[in-house]
């Protein structure tokens, strides 16, 4: 039994199709940076990674699963035909928690050291004082799992 997945993403790593084939023997995996280029292949695809625009979805005869390439799937991601279909949509909820949290702390430290002032200068001159972090309070506001 073959399984076809289309990777609809500019960020898709060129090594992913081979990794998918190794993990799922007989799988067919193809990368499309522009979903419009996948019009012929979507008709036989079982799954898609990324965003499947309505005009592409309309041609998807066998599609059973869409794995969104992001965590927050707002209303713009869904459209009537997708909502009314039996296609399962999964997201990356929780996948980026550690990465996002680490990134947020890195920016916090960069701003505390006033990197936004020094970086454009491309040289280090005494400028605005640094924020001394011990004793400071940080409030992290987030509605998703990365902000918890």
What are these regions (language model features)?
Residues 8-12, 70-71, 93-95, 143:
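Short coil/turn segments
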Residues 1-45:
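N-terminal glycine-/charge-rich "phosphate-binding" loop or analogous flexible N-terminal tail
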Residues 44-121, 131:
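Phosphate/diphosphate ligand-binding glycine-rich loop within oxidoreductases
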Residues 14, 39, 98-99, 148:
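Loop/helix-junction capping segments adjacent to catalytic residues or to phosphate/diphosphate-binding pockets
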Residues 4-7, 67, 90, 139:
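Short, well-ordered beta-strand segments
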Residues 2, 86, 134-138:
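Phosphate-coordination loops involved in phosphoryl transfer and adenosine-cofactor binding
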Residues 12-13, 53-56, 146:
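Alpha-helix capping/helix-boundary segments
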Residues 128-148:
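Rossmann-like dinucleotide/phosphate-binding beta-alpha-beta segment
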């Amino acid at each position: 039994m073959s399984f076809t997945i289309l990777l609809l993403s500019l960020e898709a790593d060129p090594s992913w199709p081979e990794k998918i084939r190794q993990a799922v023997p007989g799988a067919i995996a193809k990368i499309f940076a522009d979903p419009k280029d996948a019009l012929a292949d979507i008709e036989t695809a079982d799954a898609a990674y990324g965003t499947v625009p309505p005009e592409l979805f309309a041609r998807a005869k066998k599609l059973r699963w869409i794995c969104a390439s992001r965590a927050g799937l707002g209303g713009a991601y869904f459209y009537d035909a997708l909502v009314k279909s039996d296609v399962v949509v999964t997201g990356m909820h929780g996948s980026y928690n550690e990465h996002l949290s680490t990134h947020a702390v890195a920016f916090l430290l960069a701003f505390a050291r006033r990197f936004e002032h020094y970086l454009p200068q491309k040289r280090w001159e005494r400028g605005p004082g640094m924020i001394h972090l011990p004793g400071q309070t940080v409030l992290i506001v987030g509605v998703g799992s990365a902000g918890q």
